[in-house]
Every structure is written in C-alpha cells, then in structure tokens.
C-alpha cells in the first residue's frame, strides 16, 4: 500500500492523511481505538509486538525439537513429556494444558491421520505410514505464540504426502498476499483455490484466530470462502492454520474425550500453522525460526 492510496479505513482520504503511521510499525492510538471499538481487535503496541515475537520464537523452537523427535515407535505421550521439559527449559507455560472445558489434559496437540485437530497425546506408538500434526502454543512472560507442523513417519502413502503438501502450500499462499488493507476474506479465497487444485476440501468448523495478548482473540480467520471484509492493519497478530481433508470437509468431535476432531469419512487430514504480524508494508512470520 502506497502513501497516496485510499486509506484502508474507508474514509476516502489518502492513506498519508489518515492512518499512515508516523513511525515504522507504530500504529496510531486512533487506529487502536477504532479497531477495538469496531471489531474488538487488539492492535499491538511496539512493546507488545516484541514480547509476542519472543514468545513465538520459543514456540517455534519447541515445535522444531518435537518434530525431530517424532519417529516410529515413539509415543505421543513421550513427545508430550519432552514438551514439558522444553517448556521448563525456556521458562514457558504450555497454553493448552487445562485450557477449556473439559480441561485439555496435555501440553501439546498431536493429531494423527484422520484427526483434524486437538488430538490428545497417548501411549500408542507412532507407526510407519502415519502422518501427524504437532501443535505447540506457549506463554512467555504473559504473551502467546502458536504454530504447528506436519511430520511423516517412515514410508507414507502418496495421498498422505499430497494432503500434507497441499496444506503447506495453502498456508504459504495465504501468507504471501498479506498486507495492510487486505480484506480478511481473501485469505479463505486463496486457501480454497489451493485445496481445489488438489481435489481436496477445506475444513470450515475450525478457524485461525488473533493471538498474542490472549490465546484466542479476534479476528477469527476463516480458511474457507467467506464474506468477512475486516481490513488488515499494521499491528494485528493472528494465526493462519488451514486444515485440508482428502475427502469430505466435515468432521465430528470424539464423544469419549470431547476434544479430538476427526474426519467424518476417516480420510486423512493435514494442517500447518504460523503466527503472523501485519506490518506497514506487508507481513512478518513470527513463528519462523530465526536461524
């Protein structure tokens, strides 16, 4: 967005005469007040952004270590114990632990094969041919980071490889279009188009979300086609986490634990996730490892 373009807020003024920031990545108080009152969205201050960035880097490091440890024969409970140790090492708090109702019982989510999201670690060993999403959310000094990745165990069937590839491609394509003034619905458009090229479906029961000051904030970021016209603005932080199914988009919540979401047709599902920051000129992926 250029200085002489119309401002994203709809005032019909040029951006430079309206919400153009006086300093890089320092949105005006008027912008924060507008987004808080109109959309209940927290536009972060430079100090908050720096603390969220730190939390996101810790989250990414823990996720990276867990992905490297996920091998055939390892149980997801063993990964959860490693997660506990890593959180202590980084002086971080696992955000999922005891979250919600019923309280989530583990420090990470491990979603295998047909589990769409919110998989609960257990004592079943990982097997050759499994795919798994590991989702890590950390609290560091009171601020939150959130990211996830797919891992493939041993020799994985081609269709499972394809759905992992499609989800990552959809995430990267959605991130690539981010900039101030972009309406939120464009994210869902890009993801739907990407999934369609593979012949896969996009889960619409779960969404991305604002994150940083709280675990879950506005805006909710739909990965499917939608009509949300909220314009992105510098200082917004949120997750993009497309869940792509090989078969039908519908899922159901496991009635035995009230957390795990599974595909209704038991076909594989895949998800990748990053926390992103909207900047004055585009975006920053906060959960991208700095090394």
UniProtKB/Swiss-Prot annotation:
InterPro entries per the UniProt record, alphabetical: Creatinase/aminopeptidase-like, Pept_M24, Pept_M24_MAP, Pept_M24A_MAP1, SEC_C_motif
Binding of substrate, residues: 118, 216
Cofactor note: Binds 2 divalent metal cations per subunit. Has a high-affinity and a low affinity metal-binding site. The true nature of the physiological cofactor is under debate. The enzyme is active with cobalt, zinc, manganese or divalent iron ions. Most likely, methionine aminopeptidases function as mononuclear Fe(2+)-metalloproteases under physiological conditions, and the catalytically relevant metal-binding site has been assigned to the histidine-containing high-affinity site.
Gene Ontology CC: cytosol
Binding residue positions for a divalent metal cation 2: 146, 209, 241, 273
MF-aspect GO terms: initiator methionyl aminopeptidase activity; metal ion binding; metalloaminopeptidase activity
Keyword line: Aminopeptidase, Hydrolase, Metal-binding, Protease
Pfam families hit by this protein: Peptidase_M24, SEC-C
UniProt cross-references to SUPFAM superfamilies, sorted A to Z: Creatinase/aminopeptidase, Sec-C motif
Gene3D superfamilies assigned to the protein according to its UniProt record, in alphabetical order: 3.10.450.50, Creatinase/methionine aminopeptidase superfamily
Reaction(s) the record says it catalyses: Release of N-terminal amino acids, preferentially methionine, from peptides and arylamides
Cofactor field: Co(2+); Zn(2+); Mn(2+); Fe(2+)
EC number: 3.4.11.18
EC class of the enzyme, as a word: hydrolase
Quaternary data: Monomer.
HAMAP family, alphabetized: MetAP_1
Reported function: Removes the N-terminal methionine from nascent proteins. The N-terminal methionine is often cleaved when the second residue in the primary sequence is small and uncharged (Met-Ala-, Cys, Gly, Pro, Ser, Thr, or Val). Requires deformylation of the N(alpha)-formylated initiator methionine before it can be hydrolyzed.
Family to which the UniProt record says this protein belongs: Belongs to the peptidase M24A family. Methionine aminopeptidase type 1 subfamily.
This protein's name: Methionine aminopeptidase
Lineage of the species this protein comes from: Bacteria, Pseudomonadati, Chlamydiota, Chlamydiia, Chlamydiales
